């Protein structure tokens, strides 16, 4: 878990490692093994001065920004040899053809569109070979609007799923009626006639948002034996007592910011 800038010990992450290890041990000696690829690296937050500047960010991220690094790693480890990979990442990092909007005074219409997230970089090189599939989730609302989170497609997607008894299902968005559902979330800022198909290629509905829960946190992962290692890896590990005080708050946390970084 310390091979990335992991802030918290997520039980499900460790269960994935355990399942892959168990599966690989069951295979014949020469069989191709199930592989888990860590697409990031240790950041050096000890070099952070409290204010983000080009100079200290070069120190914090010595191998480059996360998007470029991840793109290069996937190319070297997977795409260069013609293999395929399923990448699980935060939603903005997964955008491919869609360009995430920011308010920007100097841009036309006061909106600047990000084209350098991981998915964007891969899509610019490999086109339709790279697809973005969303897991059902709340969308961030427009700036200065409440509530902070919205049900996708103005709630119509969940209404349709409700008529189907909320059974888990995956479906295409491109060229389908569900993909034509209008959306007025933050993602639509700067776009005209914005629909779900303008965001992703496909969608996986697991259950209504009201029934979703966050990952499980291993409260015993951090102890006096490894807290020093954690402090060196991540800025937010200030002490064992601080970590333990923050876990309950994080356990209830929902994504509310439309512009995550790092």
Where are these regions (language model features)?
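A substrate-binding/cap region within the structured catalytic cores of diverse enzymes
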Residues: 1-110, 118
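Extracellular hydrolytic enzyme modules, especially secreted metalloproteases
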Residues: 56-71, 99-104, 108-254
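Conserved small/polar residues in nucleotide/adenosyl-binding loops
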Residues: 255-262
């Amino acid at each position: 878990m310390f091979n990335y800038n992991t802030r918290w010990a997520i039980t499900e992450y460790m269960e994935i490692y355990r399942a892959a290890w168990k599966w690989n041990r069951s295979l014949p000696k020469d069989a191709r093994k199930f592989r888990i690829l860590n697409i990031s690296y240790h950041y050096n937050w000890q070099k952070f001065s409290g204010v983000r500047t080009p100079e200290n960010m070069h120190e914090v991220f010595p191998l480059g920004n996360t998007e470029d690094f991840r793109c290069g790693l996937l190319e070297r480890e997977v795409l260069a040899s013609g293999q395929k990979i399923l990448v699980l990442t935060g939603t903005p990092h997964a955008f491919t053809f869609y360009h995430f909007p920011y308010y920007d005074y100097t841009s036309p219409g006061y909106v600047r569109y990000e084209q350098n997230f991981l998915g964007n970089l891969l899509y610019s090189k490999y086109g339709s070979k790279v697809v973005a599939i969303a897991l059902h989730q709340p969308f961030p609302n427009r700036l200065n609007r409440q509530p902070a989170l919205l049900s996708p497609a103005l709630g119509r997607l969940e209404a349709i799923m409700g008529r189907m008894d909320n059974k888990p299902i995956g479906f295409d968005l491109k060229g389908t009626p569900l993909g034509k559902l209008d959306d007025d979330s933050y993602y639509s800022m700067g776009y005209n006639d914005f629909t779900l198909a303008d965001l992703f290629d496909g969608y996986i509905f697991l259950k209504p948002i009201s029934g979703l829960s966050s990952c499980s946190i291993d409260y015993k992962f951090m102890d006096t034996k490894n807290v020093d290692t954690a402090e060196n890896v991540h800025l937010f590990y200030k002490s064992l007592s601080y970590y333990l005080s923050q876990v309950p708050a994080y356990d209830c946390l929902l994504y509310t910011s439309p512009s995550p970084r790092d």
